[in-house]
């Protein structure tokens, strides 16, 4: 894909507005997964070495108003430690305080601004807010693939006001995902998990046209089991989507894509998540809640993956946050990692929950061919949808 790269511009002593994705999971004040911060480091370090003045912007969570729990101040210490360099935090995004801080910067300095989503103009893709952000810098760099499916002020609108380029993380994401969706190395298996099937209808339709096996997990699998007249007890599923499921099944049959759903499951009874009970799918009871795949399904999925050349994975297979229901997700993760290390499988994994699952399995992104930082962005890319952030950069070449 042809997009402008930061390697093709003069950065010396220039103020660079760098859009990253520091929307990292935090619990009890601790960052649980630093993957997204790590992915931004090569671009930040490149800008430092090029003697630029780096102004970092990001969103964090989904605040409805200013909220200290969702302040980017929470990541400043970790960022400084990883860079081995002092990063100054400014508790605003625009305005006089920020302008003064930028004016005082020397080449190689780094400042981190406050959460973009504390401002309504960000999600509204507001031109005035984008213009205010742009006034801080000489150059804009997008290094947030995971946000580039959003038409937000700091992602797409801002490119109207500044020379705009892609950072290394964004470039890497596009390179690997373009390779993945070329669908050349067959057989291809896709694993799709998660809660709401309605958010993944488009990508499921696309995948049934391209892959050999579509493995379903999570509540999405519950929907398909229910559609097949299997009793799913009290398990979570989405109502009113049977017509969509029918279309997916028809498309899969037409394209010789085998849809794989659990043949056995691990369930909780009476919402007791501390203990799992194994059931064949035909033996699920009315009070059961399906929270993971069973051992036979894990074996089936393992065999399918072992026969594949390419794997695409979005969303966990089970509720891995509870140890009693983590064996499916972690088991498949370890099989995929092993085959990847042996050079037998190209593995592309995407989605915020997937990053957490990798950590839960005691693995890192180095154990797979590529781990995308994107969730919705990953799905949109697989679906073939235009991504506003990427399209905005491409327009700069016109």
Swiss-Prot record:
Its EC number is 2.7.2.3. It is found in: Cytoplasm. Keywords: ATP-binding, Cytoplasm, Glycolysis, Kinase, Nucleotide-binding, Transferase. Pathway: Carbohydrate degradation; glycolysis; pyruvate from D-glyceraldehyde 3-phosphate: step 2/5. The keyword ATP-binding applies. Monomer. Substrate binds at residues 21-23, 36, 59-62, 117, 150. One of its GO terms (biological process) is gluconeogenesis. It is an enzyme of class 2 (transferase). ATP binds at residues 200, 321, 351-354. GO terms for molecular function: ADP binding; ATP binding; phosphoglycerate kinase activity. InterPro entries: Phosphoglycerate_kinase, Phosphoglycerate_kinase_N, Phosphoglycerate_kinase_sf. GO terms for cellular component: cytosol. Belongs to the phosphoglycerate kinase family. Coiled coil: none annotated. This is Phosphoglycerate kinase. It catalyses: (2R)-3-phosphoglycerate + ATP = (2R)-3-phospho-glyceroyl phosphate + ADP.
